[in-house]
């Protein structure tokens, strides 16, 4: 930063946006191939490309922010605005799923038997695994807040413990959600109920996996002393994202599991 006369980060040319776009193309094309032809070659290639891109892109950002000092207060302010806009876009993404659900459930057509859940669908009991999942995510929201406060106070041990607890709760939620999918009496192809249920809860599960990965990276960085009480936006962004995942699940639980059953 000594050779600059301003506080802004002039990003160097990077191949990762291009490889990220390529991995997204391979992932979506691979999903189509998997769904229609039961072939996982393209999907596996997309996952591998995506993982490699994430690793190397995160590596570059950590190098720029932690070791090269490019993330000045002005740059961090821009990153915060970017993260807020990203979460807002995710809100509208899930709003589409809720719209589809309520559009179909509030005025069920004759094809659905004139009722909701549709005739022939046995919904999951909202007081069993879904309620446990809700408790797990709410507990993880408490632990991530504990981790944030510990970081602000400079308490490394509590920060490490709270962050590890949050990650374990996220993994536990993912396992419970996967086991629930195997126990359902309906599938994604069982009309509008199956489609909206698995699309909404499945994409939320994907966001939990993404958030857990985000937190694992933060834990590894915390163990390497990358975060301080005044310079920790990477963790702060992960915490915001995790709270967003918590809130979305509460709406999913109330709408699809409880009211929709």
From Swiss-Prot:
Catalysis performed (reactions): 4 Fe(II)-[cytochrome c] + O2 + 8 H(+)(in) = 4 Fe(III)-[cytochrome c] + 2 H2O + 4 H(+)(out)
GO biological process, one term: mitochondrial electron transport, cytochrome c to oxygen
Membrane-spanning segments: 16-34, 41-66, 73-105, 129-152, 156-183, 191-223, 233-256
Gene3D superfamilies per UniProt: 1.10.287.70, Cytochrome c oxidase, subunit III, four-helix bundle (1.20.120.80)
Coiled-coil blocks: none
Gene Ontology molecular function terms on file: cytochrome-c oxidase activity
Topological domains, Mitochondrial matrix: 2-15, 67-72, 153-155, 224-232
Enzyme Commission number, as recorded: 7.1.1.9
Compartment annotation: Mitochondrion inner membrane
Keywords for this protein: Membrane, Mitochondrion, Mitochondrion inner membrane, Translocase, Transmembrane, Transmembrane helix
InterPro entries xref list: Cyt_c/ubiquinol_Oxase_su3, Cyt_c_oxase_su3_dom, Cyt_c_oxidase-like_su3, Cyt_c_oxidase_su3-like_sf, Cyt_c_oxidase_su3_a-hlx
GO cellular component, one term: mitochondrial inner membrane
Chief location: mitochondrion
Mitochondrial intermembrane side: 35-40, 106-128, 184-190, 257-261
EC top class, as a word: translocase
Classification via Pfam families: COX3
Topology term for the membrane: Multi-pass membrane protein
Family of this protein: Belongs to the cytochrome c oxidase subunit 3 family.
Primary role: Component of the cytochrome c oxidase, the last enzyme in the mitochondrial electron transport chain which drives oxidative phosphorylation. The respiratory chain contains 3 multisubunit complexes succinate dehydrogenase (complex II, CII), ubiquinol-cytochrome c oxidoreductase (cytochrome b-c1 complex, complex III, CIII) and cytochrome c oxidase (complex IV, CIV), that cooperate to transfer electrons derived from NADH and succinate to molecular oxygen, creating an electrochemical gradient over the inner membrane that drives transmembrane transport and the ATP synthase.
Record's subunit section: Component of the cytochrome c oxidase (complex IV, CIV), a multisubunit enzyme composed of 14 subunits. The complex is composed of a catalytic core of 3 subunits MT-CO1, MT-CO2 and MT-CO3, encoded in the mitochondrial DNA, and 11 supernumerary subunits COX4I, COX5A, COX5B, COX6A, COX6B, COX6C, COX7A, COX7B, COX7C, COX8 and NDUFA4, which are encoded in the nuclear genome.
Name of the featured protein: Cytochrome c oxidase subunit 3
Lineage of source species: Eukaryota, Metazoa, Chordata, Craniata, Vertebrata
């Amino acid at each position: 930063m000594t050779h600059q006369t301003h506080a802004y980060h002039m990003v160097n040319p990077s191949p990762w946006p291009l490889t990220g776009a390529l991995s997204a193309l391979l992932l979506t094309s691979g999903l189509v191939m998997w769904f229609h032809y039961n072939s996982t070659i393209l999907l596996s290639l997309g996952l591998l490309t995506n993982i490699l891109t994430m690793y190397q892109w995160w590596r570059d950002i950590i190098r720029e922010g932690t070791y090269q000092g490019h993330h000045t207060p002005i740059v961090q302010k821009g990153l915060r605005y970017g993260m807020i806009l990203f979460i807002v876009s995710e809100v509208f993404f899930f709003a589409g799923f809720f719209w589809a659900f309520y559009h179909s459930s509030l005025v069920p057509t004759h094809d659905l038997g004139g009722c909701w859940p549709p005739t022939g669908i046995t919904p999951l009991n909202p007081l069993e695994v879904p309620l446990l999942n809700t408790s797990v995510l709410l507990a993880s929201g408490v632990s991530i807040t504990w981790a944030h406060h510990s970081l602000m106070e400079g308490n490394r041990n509590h920060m490490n413990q709270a962050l590890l607890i949050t990650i374990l709760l996220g993994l536990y939620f993912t396992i419970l959600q996967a086991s629930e999918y195997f126990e359902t009496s309906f599938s994604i192809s069982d009309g509008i109920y199956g489609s909206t249920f698995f699309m909404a809860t499945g994409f939320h599960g994907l966001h939990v996996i993404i958030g857990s990965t985000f937190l694992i990276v933060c834990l590894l960085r915390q163990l390497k002393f990358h975060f301080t009480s005044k310079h920790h936006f990477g963790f702060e962004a992960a915490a915001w994202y995790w709270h967003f995942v918590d809130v979305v699940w509460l709406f999913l639980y109330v709408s699809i599991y409880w009211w929709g059953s």
